[in-house]
Swiss-Prot record:
GO terms for cellular component: cytosolic large ribosomal subunit. Keywords: Ribonucleoprotein, Ribosomal protein, RNA-binding, rRNA-binding. One of its GO terms (molecular function) is structural constituent of ribosome. It comes from Verminephrobacter eiseniae (strain EF01-2). This is Large ribosomal subunit protein uL15. GO terms for biological process: translation.
Length: 143
């Protein structure tokens, strides 16, 4: 058996119904569209979200909130990640080269999540109060 020779079982596939090809077919003349009206015409149907002139739901509800674009340039790094990284000195460039933060990232903050078991010297990176205490307890420093 070859993949290109596999065929469906006889009678398993039905031919597509061809509409508008004479009254003997059962779907001639109006082709299943009924008589008159917008939906019977070519190109005749409302746009998505149109409610017949009633104020649409999307406009009835109030605007709310926004997505800060500055978040695209910020990133967080955990203590566990720093521990796995294996570098003695860490800055934003080192994190980018290690692939821990994206290329567009400008601001990095270390958060206290997990544990740090070795000394790490941070420079040009923000830290939370808990993370700073954990880094200094492990013999590291924050510049």
């Amino acid at each position: 058996m070859q993949l290109n020779s596999i065929k469906p079982a006889a009678g398993a596939k039905h031919a597509k119904r061809r509409v508008g090809r004479g009254i003997g077919s059962g779907l001639g003349k109006t082709a299943g569209r009924g008589h008159k009206g917008q939906k019977s015409r070519a190109g005749g149907y409302h746009k998505v979200g149109f409610e017949g002139g009633q104020m649409p739901l999307q406009r009835r509800l109030p605007k709310r909130g926004f997505k800060s674009q500055s978040l695209r340039f910020n990133a967080e790094v955990t203590l566990t990640t720093l521990d796995r990284l294996g570098l003695a000195e860490v800055d934003v460039l080192a994190l980018k080269q290690a692939g821990l933060v994206g290329e567009l990232i400008k601001v990095v903050k270390v958060i206290k999540s997990g544990a740090l078991n070795r000394a790490v010297k941070l420079s040009g990176v923000g830290v939370t109060a808990g993370a700073k205490a954990a880094i200094e307890a492990a013999g590291g420093s924050v510049a």
